[in-house]
Amino acid sequence: VFLLSGALVAGNYEKAYTLLDALFYQREEPIAILGALATSYVDMVRVRAALENGGTYGDAAQYGDYKGKDFRLKKAQQNVRGVPQQVLRESLHLLLEADMALKGSRLEPRIILDELIAKLLLAARRERA
């Protein structure tokens, strides 16, 4: 899922959908996919905040349980390069909407996640245009 979040913030449609297809092929639970994606985006928000305040990615560890999970913050730092704060905020909002849809909608989970991926990609691309 770390690769998926990286593809999303980079605006890489093909890679994002290939990775999502692979996760569904492996029978990953949609709510688990969404949870892992949300975690990756929260990591990126925390790292972005630390960097904007003159710190390092490691400083973001004080905002969550990262003991033994330093790799998540390193990956978040790689993914967040060049991603505006507004994209991260919008992405968190989209993730929340998808979470509510997965938990309270009769739509197929795959449709909800496909729509989420499209919206996250559009958010990333719009800011780079």
Predicted feature residues:
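Helix-rich C-terminal "collar"/helical-bundle subdomain used as an assembly and partner-interaction module
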Residues: 3, 9-129
